[in-house]
């Protein structure tokens, strides 16, 4: 399973599926979740 293609900080904190991928936060360059 790949991390969500697009994320922002609100999505990372509020969306449980995204937040499990965003353990290292959102990559501001690629707009992807870092694991």
From Swiss-Prot:
Signal peptide interval: none
**4-carboxyglutamate modifications at:** 14, 17
Q: Which residues are listed as membrane-spanning?
A: none
- Subcellular locations according to the entry: Secreted
**4-hydroxyproline modification sites?**
3-4
Tissues/organs with expression? Expressed by the venom duct.
Domain writeup: The cysteine framework is IX (C-C-C-C-C-C).
UniProt-recorded name of the protein: Turripeptide gsp9a
Give the organism, scientific name.
Gemmula speciosa
């Amino acid at each position: 399973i790949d991390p969500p293609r697009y994320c922002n900080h609100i999505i990372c904190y509020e969306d449980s599926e995204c937040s499990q991928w965003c353990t290292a936060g959102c990559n501001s360059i690629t707009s992807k979740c870092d694991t």
